[in-house]
Curated annotation (Swiss-Prot):
One Gene Ontology MF term: ABC-type vitamin B12 transporter activity
List of catalytic residues: C334, H445
Entry annotated with the keyword Disulfide bond: no
PANTHER family: COBYRIC ACID SYNTHASE, DETHIOBIOTIN SYNTHETASE
Protein name, as recorded: Cobyric acid synthase
Pathway noted in the entry: Cofactor biosynthesis; adenosylcobalamin biosynthesis
Location of the GATase cobBQ-type domain: 254-453
InterPro entries from the UniProt entry: Class_I_gatase-like (IPR029062), CobQ/CobB/MinD/ParA_Nub-bd_dom (IPR002586), CobQ_GATase1 (IPR033949), CobQ_N (IPR047045), CobQ_synth (IPR004459), GATase_3 (IPR011698), P-loop_NTPase (IPR027417)
Amino acid sequence: MNAMAKLIMVQGTSSNVGKSILVTALCRIFKQDGYKVAPFKSQNMALNAFVTQEGGEIGRAQAVQAEACGIAPSVDMNPILMKPEADSKSQIVVNGKVDRTISAREYYEYAPLLLDTALAALNRLREQNDIVVIEGAGSPAEINLRQREIVNMRIAKTAGAPVLLAGDIDRGGVFASLIGTIDLLEPEERSYVKGYLINKFRGDASLLKPAIDVLEDRTSIPVLGIIPYLRNMAIAQEDSVYLDECKSGLGETDLDIAVIRLPRISNYDDFDALATDGASVRFVSKTGEIGNPDLIIIPGTKSTIPDMEYLWQNGLAETIIKKAGKGTHVLGVCGGYQILGKMIYDPHKTESETTELKGLGLLDTETTFEKEKSTTQVSGQVRFNNGLLADMAGCEVGGYEIHMGRTRLFTAQPAFQITKTPKGPADYLDGASNAEGTVLGTYIHGIFESDSFRRGFLNAIRRYKGIPERQAGYFDRDKEYDKLADIVRASIDMNKIYDILNEGIR
């Protein structure tokens, strides 16, 4: 192909229609077909973040899409990241670094100034690849945002990207939403839409033909694919809707894991890998839903103090404390690790007006929020050797850190030794455990993608439970990307999509 990559864009009739997973699939298909491909989303509002090798933050979805492309994630793939915080404000990350925290109204005054930043990032990707697959956000028909949006039709028009419009048939009303979206677009914008993708279909696709005929007749835009509802895909999803589904491994499960669904939950895909090794992973938001799990996980959160307040207010805090007192294992990751401690301090009011709050007190630690955020990839080893980490001293771990808090240990024991970051050798401690090893905290996101660590961690729980250990399943996301690509390729007209890609906008 030419020096500047060709473009194709996936927009949707609303949030949660499956844009991210469709972009992931297209990225993998183009890679399978021998092209050098990269994903791009100019502006992403998400709590799921990833840290690149350079230490920059991007949306987790773009990191997944990059992985499907077979390339390392970069900040150019998501130059503007919005991370919602408490009090209707968002932290704005530009080119991987925190830029400011502002309200929604302030952001939409500010956003047009970031268009050049987004386009510069896109152009850098175009110079390095054959194809760039662009993802939109929400809907292009949000007429109240039309003048200030920089993620849907403004990107398509400025960059010259043909658009595939996706709709979710599973929730009903897909034909009304597709026709309504087209009707609300400006005439010039409509000319960019080259085809429809009907996503999340269950049943006999031939039954849709009468409705498809009406859709195509009314809009003069063809339906290019009907993609089935995807189940049991070990691929991280952008939207939290999929948290309602229990994730179980293949075959029988012998461990029950309850993840607390915090209001501002982040990086919830940290635990996908656990479901490949005989564990059921379910997200719970009420005390009555916890039951009697083998492990309670408190996940990451964008706003630790407001979510800690939530745990106290609805009784979840007391339930977790009682369960831990009776021997239930508890794990906290990032914000969840901070919640496990005795106190959380926010002297700079980074998260809210609350400057200090009592934690669960399950670890003898205290966390203080600082002004600077730590964002880095890490690798290291298990240091502690009891309970959840029994017989695992020296086991290699890896992942990435995103946090503004600094946690101080008192009688709690350090859990991990960090030995390397992208900057070179490192020598510092991470995480903490109680003496018995039944309560564990860490700042490392993605720690369970290590097969050996995951096996040892889950088998420690099995030994405590008195059931046989298991060999680790191989968490092969590469295989999952191929599976996704095969399903989507079989469901869409790739010949027509290649025609659209090559013709561009005419």
